[in-house]
Amino acid sequence: MMINEQIRAREVRLVGANGDQLGIKSRNDALDLAANLNLDLVLVAPNAKPPVCRIMDYGKFRFEQQKKEKEQRKNQKVISMKEVRLSPTIDEHDFNTKLRNAIKFLEKGDKVKASIRFKGRAITHKEIGQRVLDRFSEACAEVSTVESKPKMEGRSMFLVLAPKNDK
């Protein structure tokens, strides 16, 4: 953003400190007006014909802008990915424990990656792993939506569940 002497246009459309239109003035007249008010001349619309400048306290303006940006960054929610590891031959109790953990993560707003690692000859029975992941996603259906269907990657199969937005 250009201020004061950085502005190169000969004529500018001037907006006063309180937002009122002051018309088209020469750059020097606008600079003198801003200096008399102990404020800065700030170029707000460089592509307009003639460019639009506003008389304001630039330091205060920058401070307000930075405050808004900081507030926006603070309000952004960071979604993290939690992983739950299952096996193709998982026992019922272990399955329920993993399921409870996954539901807890989803309720907190995190995504859950459920993965099954096939060891040894178990890779020949991918359909068993597929059934376990399908059962897992159905059990989490109340609090989640399937973001990516079960798919193989190397020796492991995984699916990603995202929390449901009930707002």
Curated annotation (Swiss-Prot):
GO terms for biological process: ribosome disassembly. One of its GO terms (cellular component) is cytosol. The keyword Cytoplasm applies. SUPFAM superfamilies: Translation initiation factor IF3, C-terminal domain, Translation initiation factor IF3, N-terminal domain. Pfam families: IF3_C, IF3_N. Signal peptide: none annotated. Gene3D superfamilies: Translation initiation factor 3 (IF-3), C-terminal domain (3.30.110.10), Translation initiation factor 3 (IF-3), N-terminal domain (3.10.20.80). The keyword Transferase does not apply. Keywords: Cytoplasm, Initiation factor, Protein biosynthesis. Its main location: cytoplasm. It is found in: Cytoplasm. GO terms for molecular function: ribosome binding; translation initiation factor activity. InterPro entries: T_IF-3_C_sf, T_IF-3_N_sf, Translation_initiation_fac3_CS, Translation_initiation_fac_3, Translation_initiation_fac_3_C, Translation_initiation_fac_3_N. PROSITE patterns: IF3. Belongs to the IF-3 family. IF-3 binds to the 30S ribosomal subunit and shifts the equilibrium between 70S ribosomes and their 50S and 30S subunits in favor of the free subunits, thus enhancing the availability of 30S subunits on which protein synthesis initiation begins. Monomer. This is Translation initiation factor IF-3. It comes from Bacillus cereus (strain ATCC 14579 / DSM 31 / CCUG 7414 / JCM 2152 / NBRC 15305 / NCIMB 9373 / NCTC 2599 / NRRL B-3711).
